[in-house]
Amino acid sequence: RTNLSERGFTDTDELYRKITSVYTWDTLKRTDWFVDYQNLFTFTGVMSQRGMFASAAMEMIEAGETERAVEILDKCQSVIPVENFPLDMTMYGFANERDMVSLIEAYYLAGESAKASALCSSMSDDILVSCKFFLRHYEYAEEYFDSCYTVLGVLSSMADEYGDSALADSIRLRFNKLLE
């Protein structure tokens, strides 16, 4: 039985076939369509597309199929455009940030440190922009600022854990500069 944080058993061959051959993701990857709040909520919260890709990649990694996992992770980046589905959606309170952290960790676990680092860096850049905004309006946005702080802490800790101390230090330094 699956829930938001745990996957059930998966047939990795069938999962891989469906993600790479059956589903085309044509509509999801279009950047010329407007994605409204309801679709953001659906595709990054209720039925998280990034979460589905992250779960599939982790399942592949656990099965020892790291090449397939990387292909799934790369596909996620190509079919879920940040123009429509930003890396940082803390202001909505969806599951997106958790799913992004899972994608980054999956890249690290698959041995793709450069891709993990690039995605982690891009996400932290976006979250730092939100942090700055929420800090400016802290009286009204304390909860959102705290959410950003938490995600940045997770990202910097994960970068440290996987040997990317320069990135971890950069995230912490840039956050601390916001507080000065």
Label every PLM stretch briefly.
Residues 1-180:
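C-terminal luminal/periplasmic domains and tails of membrane-associated envelope-modifying transferases
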